[in-house]
């Protein structure tokens, strides 16, 4: 069982690469405790012996998205040295995700706790998050979790999932029907999903020998995707040449940025490019500016989404990350302070809040943003900064 109320789960927050002033550390530490308690106590549901479904919230949408679940699992893995239950919960989720979940045609938009498909729509990024969660577990635990029934190991499962990705043979880009906001894609290739594809290929390459995969082929995939991002997504922007939100790979593109597209903001954290990369910098400066149609103006304004009006905490998290990496510590501090001001006493964050007043507008229980912020506070995803390349 998770620790009871009032019992701290985490030690003092470790030094990090993101801007975190000393005066905000105690409040952020409290949010970490609350988010960790919510995942362990409310969203990581035991559905069978040795199996857990991680749902997006415990009241309104008792459904599982592989995307939301990944960021919650990332918090557990980031806290695994401090929380004795964390590794076991993630292992049980991986067993549910790869075993019980109905994956006919891939993971769909959302699944019920019994593994059945709830919303039948294919999102390319949600085929990649289960692979990353498995790789993250291997890194944190030093060993692979027990494979699902009927499988001697993980190699065949991973290889089959990787081969099934709808990657265009000419472009090297992966396509999806919907974007991470659960809205129909205007163009087939989404920037944040290609960043995620590069990251997954890079991570798989490092463990190719253990999984029986071809390291050279994975390196080639990563190189192709990185080159395609620079070649196929470039477009003019108010801060210089930037990357488009989505493209058809053959000349058409859309300039926009959404609070749901964390991988774009995380690109330097994962090592795709250094923070001083001009195209990434211009992309994120546009994302965090009123020139972006996804921006929500107001006293409490910030990055939002066409999916639901208002300022999104997921957008505030992107602002904290991007402005920290860009060296704008004053703006990074304001973004973090806004997140902590909006957070409930239990550490949870809503899906969206009013840009004029800060009042919550949607989803009072939403594990994804609080889990992501807490994982970042514990040092998740920062190792790639040391190996980032501008190539």
Task: Specify the residue positions occupied by each region the protein language model found.
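Extended ligand-binding clefts on enzyme/binding-domain cores
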Residues: 66, 156, 169, 173, ...
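Aromatic-rich carbohydrate-recognition surfaces in CAZymes
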Residues: 62-169, 194, 364-381
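Well-ordered alpha-helical scaffold segments within catalytic/enzyme domains
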Residues: 15-24, 70-84, 129-147, 195-211, ...
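Low-complexity, Ser/Thr/Pro/Gly-enriched N-terminal "stalk/linker" regions
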Residues: 1-64, 92, 347
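Acidic/His metal-coordination segments adjacent to aromatic residues that form catalytic metal sites
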Residues: 48-58, 106-122, 171-189, 249, ...
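Structured, solvent-exposed acidic/aromatic patches
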Residues: 152-155, 177-178, 184-198, 202-211
